[in-house]
Amino acid sequence: MSVPAGWEPVIGLEIHVQLKTRTKMFCRCANVWGEPENTQTCPVCLAHPGVLPVPNRRAIEWAVKLGLALGCRIADRAYFHRKNYFYPDLPKGYQISQYDSPLCEGGRVVVPLADRDLEIGIVRAHLEEDAAKTIHVGGATGRIHGADTSLVDFNRGGTPLVEIVTEPDIRSAEEARRFLQLLRQTIVELGISDAEMETGTLRVDANVSVRPAGSTELRTRTEIKNMNSFSYIARGIEAEAARQVAVWEGGGEVVQETFDFDAGTGALTPRRAKEEADDYRYFPEPDLVPVEPPAFFHREGPRHVRRSRRRPFSS
């Protein structure tokens, strides 16, 4: 499926990278995959009353390392915030994340294509904790729609994530796929994550809108989730772009919402209205002091990153 002639997609990506530190982001529980359900937990990651988080220094260092590889500015001081929402996989009722003072921001990535180099801006790369894993039992798709029962495995809850947010500089599904392949290669070479989409250590959401070719306007965007391979991401983007073109050409209005993409059928299933920052009621995390990246990274960071990788990102 391709985008109809006369239109172009406008695509931005949100990439979640699960770091392979030995312990979780704010507690001493082991950060391992494949253990029996709900065996890698403690009062901190289960949000028992009175417990306090303690940041994982290695996760902070690795997030800075990735930010440097993406050409980001590293903050002298960054803050953690509470991102408030109520899902069963979030026992505190909020996620510890970063809002207006991220660890890394303002990066730039050059992706070589067959006919040119594509420059993609990096808005930010920030640290946060992962939610638990929800398992939907029954139904045909393994998702909440039509499921008989939902189970929660808290082993994943609290594991360290870096979220990378790109500018909407991508204009095709193929450009998105190429960028993600190079990004994954970089992450693996840095040694900070396995970055495997099959196991969820690399997860990608795509924000998609369309506009008349040659236009500079930014129209209403939607978000696509649950795409677990680069080829599925490309197919999901193309399907959503084609759907939006049909809506606009039919005289309708695209609604800002979130979709699940079913790679088997090619169907896009509405999930919920897409949230904005105000919906999460961010406020500073009172139980954590500001993060001040080690002076080592400001002094030797770029050289350290070059020693950690076999080739620059843009090759």
Question: Where would I find each of the regions flagged by the language model?
Answer:
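Basic, nucleic-acid-interacting segments
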Residues: 1-313
